[in-house]
């Protein structure tokens, strides 16, 4: 047999290494609708490794942007031209002008090109201390992408035209242990031909019965089933456990939630057992945790609440979206639970207009956690994932954690919250919540584009400030929230007296004269809000006493429900660790520039790259 030439052996080894590298990227996202641009990435110590697989023989652009556009973005452009690789670190200014970075922080590992595709693999440190680079954190990031059929140098900076876009991702979401759906049974909870009204916000509720199991099983994965072309219509889905005293008669109908004619059975469904929001994908439970079904303590009847967002008032929409739950008789060690924490959704939560930033806080108080955990789990519960939830005015959300007056590391955060991308964040390390701890859901809003008050409520034009904590082992605590005192808020704008007893909602103001016979909502809108008044009001509401919500399943309550509490006094705020920057380090790589050159030249003779390019 004729021996292989050394360069052929080398080429085979390199291509094999490239294919193996593709399998080492645990995260994958298709960035465009035509599946022409595929992003793979993975954490490598203090850096992030990327692999781009794009259907073009020209340049490929990739970037990180605060707002999803080209202005003030961190960009890298690369490709293979004439058998030689190129990869350049760029940035854009506020006018979207592309400029080469003096400090090159993206490091090429390898590049390949065939008759249809270009593959680029490169890395970058999370923190470079380059003012032209965007730090990579656990927050949402708007990934921007573009490509062209020509390389960058052929005719200057070729405009990418329509082959561009943006997608929100969480690049540092920890790797999760996937389960093979083929090995699991599943059942679907989906709406059946729901007529979505031609109004901006609809909450539709439908009862379901969990398929009867004769022994305990664990749900290990939940996937959204969103009807095609309804990805922007279905804003979120909540699944509630209902009273075990119901019977099959409740299954015959769906109805608008929170409606005066809503069926009485809906009021028995208070315990959230799963939450999905727009932009999110399926959720896989950790290997040691599952959602229990099949026992007397588990949900038999569930209520699925679907939030439809129809701002264009489109008529004739029919929806069949829902959830798919995968389950197994092979039990995990722990049962999962969900706690809804934050601000109770209410008109008592309000935000003045014209504010560049306004902060609201929802408290899961030490009194509630002391009572509930002290009775059910004195050694604490373990949080493994968090979903942070707000609406259109939301800009950032933090879940703060306090113990004995000392602030702990943030439980979860998103400094670049995207209303259109809300999913459970897997925590890098599980966090223990102990009796007597405090949790604060801190939401940052911007209302610079609004001329009237923004109110807490169900519409996406209203606001929420909530966190959904996935934890184990399951205890009898479903909601841990707060409502700020409304009367002190009204005193800020000069309200002196309201009509009592309260017979209408919103209640009516009696004095002073300028607000007489106005509802408190009308009075707040009538007040002349300035930025300075808004700042003073914000300082006030963060110090107000609050009404505590501390709920069990089946509409039961812990004894502290309805009592008054005060925000915690923080003796020792958490000090973040200093950022260590690196711009010169590169991921360990066995491919030298000389070896890479062989790949660049030889790859042009390869018909395709096998399974790594689709």
UniProtKB/Swiss-Prot annotation:
Q: Which residues carry out catalysis? A: 203, 389
Please tell me where Cu cation B binds in this chain: 389, 391, 464
- First-listed, main subcellular location of the protein, grouped into a coarse class: endoplasmic reticulum
- Bilayer-crossing residues are 593-613
Question: Which residues are tagged as glycosylated in the record?
Answer: 114, 247, 476, 517
Q: Which residues bind Cu cation A?
A: 235-236, 307
Q: Name one GO biological process term.
A: norepinephrine biosynthetic process
Cofactor(s) required, per the database record: Cu(2+)
For this record, the Gene Ontology CC terms, alphabetical, are:
endoplasmic reticulum membrane; extracellular space; secretory granule membrane
Q: How is the cofactor bound?
A: Binds 2 copper ions per subunit.
- Protein name in UniProt: DBH-like monooxygenase protein 1
Q: What are the annotated disulfide bridges?
A: 205-257, 242-269, 364-480, 368-550, 443-465
Compartment(s) of residence: Endoplasmic reticulum membrane
Report the sequence similarity comment from the record: Belongs to the copper type II ascorbate-dependent monooxygenase family.
Q: Which UniProt keyword terms apply here?
A: Copper, Disulfide bond, Endoplasmic reticulum, Glycoprotein, Membrane, Metal-binding, Monooxygenase, Oxidoreductase, Signal, Transmembrane, Transmembrane helix
Query: Which regions of this chain are Lumenal-facing, per the record's topological domains?
Result: 23-592
Gene Ontology molecular function terms on file: copper ion binding; dopamine beta-monooxygenase activity
Which InterPro entries does the protein's record reference?
Answer: Cu2_ascorb_mOase-like_C, Cu2_ascorb_mOase_N, Cu2_ascorb_mOase_N_sf, Cu2_monoox_C, DBH-like, DOH_DOMON, DOMON_domain, PHM/PNGase_F_dom_sf
Q: Which residues form the DOMON domain?
A: 35-148
Protein's UniProt keywords contain Hydrolase: no
The signal peptide stretch is 1-22
Q: What is its EC number?
A: 1.14.17.-
What highest taxon heads this organism's lineage? Eukaryota
Task: Specify the protein's topology with respect to the membrane.
Answer: Single-pass type I membrane protein
């Amino acid at each position: 047999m004729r021996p292989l030439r050394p360069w052929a052996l080398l080429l085979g080894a390199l291509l094999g290494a490239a294919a193996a590298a593709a399998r080492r990227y645990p995260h994958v996202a298709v960035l465009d609708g035509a599946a022409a641009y595929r992003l793979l990435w993975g954490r490598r110590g203090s850096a992030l490794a990327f692999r781009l697989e794009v259907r073009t023989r020209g340049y490929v652009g990739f970037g990180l942007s605060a707002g999803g556009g080209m202005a003030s973005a961190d960009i890298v452009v690369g490709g293979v031209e004439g058998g030689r690789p190129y990869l350049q670190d760029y940035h854009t200014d506020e006018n979207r002008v592309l400029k080469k970075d003096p400090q090159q922080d993206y490091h090429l590992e390898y590049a390949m090109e065939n008759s249809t595709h270009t593959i680029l693999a490169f890395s970058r440190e999370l923190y470079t201390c380059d003012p032209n680079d965007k730090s990579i954190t656990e927050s949402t990031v708007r990934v921007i992408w573009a490509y062209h059929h020509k390389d960058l140098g052929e005719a200057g900076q070729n405009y990418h035209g329509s082959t561009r876009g943006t997608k929100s991702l969480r690049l540092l979401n920890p790797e999760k242990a996937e389960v093979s759906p083929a090995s699991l049974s599943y059942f679907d909870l989906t709406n059946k031909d729901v007529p979505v009204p031609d109004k901006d916000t609809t909450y539709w509720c439908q009862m379901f019965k969990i398929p009867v199991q004769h022994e305990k099983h664990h749900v290990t994965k939940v996937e959204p089933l969103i009807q095609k072309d309804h990805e922007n219509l279905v804003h979120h889905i909540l699944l509630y456990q209902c009273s075990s005293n119901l019977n099959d008669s409740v299954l015959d109908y769906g109805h608008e939630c929170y409606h005066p004619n809503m069926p009485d059975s809906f009021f028995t469904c208070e315990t959230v057992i799963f939450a999905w929001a727009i932009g999110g994908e399926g959720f896989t439970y950790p290997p040691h945790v599952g959602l229990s079904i099949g026992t007397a303590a588990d949900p038999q009847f569930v209520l699925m609440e679907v939030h439809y967002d129809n701002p264009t008032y489109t008529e004739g929409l029919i929806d069949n979206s829902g959830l798919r739950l995968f389950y197994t008789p092979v039990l995990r060690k722990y049962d999962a639970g969900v706690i809804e924490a934050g601000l109770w959704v209410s008109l008592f939560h309000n935000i003045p207009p014209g504010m560049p930033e306004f902060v609201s806080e929802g408290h899961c108080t030490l009194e509630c956690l002391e009572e509930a955990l002290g009775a059910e789990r004195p050694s604490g519960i373990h949080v493994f994932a968090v979903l942070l939830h707000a609406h259109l005015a939301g800009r950032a959300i933090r879940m703060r954690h306090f113990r004995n007056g000392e602030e702990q590391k943030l439980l979860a955060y998103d400094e670049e919250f995207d209303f259109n991308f809300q999913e459970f964040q897997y925590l890098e390390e599980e966090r223990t919540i102990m009796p007597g701890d405090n949790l604060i859901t801190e939401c940052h809003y911007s209302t610079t584009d609004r001329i009237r008050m923004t109110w807490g409520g169900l519409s996406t034009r209203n606001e929420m400030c909530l966190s959904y904590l996935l934890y184990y082992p399951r205890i009898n605590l479903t909601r841990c929230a707060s409502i700020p005192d409304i009367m002190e808020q009204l005193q800020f704008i000069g309200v002196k007296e309201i009509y009592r007893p309260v017979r209408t909602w919103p209640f009516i103001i009696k004095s002073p004269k300028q607000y007489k016979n106005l509802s408190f909502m009308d009075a707040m809108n009538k007040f002349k809000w300035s930025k300075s008044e808004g700042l003073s009001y914000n300082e006030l509401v963060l110090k107000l006493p609050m009404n505590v919500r501390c709920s069990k399943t089946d509409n039961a309550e812990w004894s502290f429900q309805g009592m008054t509490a005060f925000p915690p006094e923080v003796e020792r705020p958490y000090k973040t660790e200093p950022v260590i920057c690196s711009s010169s380090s590169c991921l360990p790589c066995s491919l030298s520039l000389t070896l890479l050159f062989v790949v660049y030249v030889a790859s042009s003779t390869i018909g395709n790259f096998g399974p790594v390019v689709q």
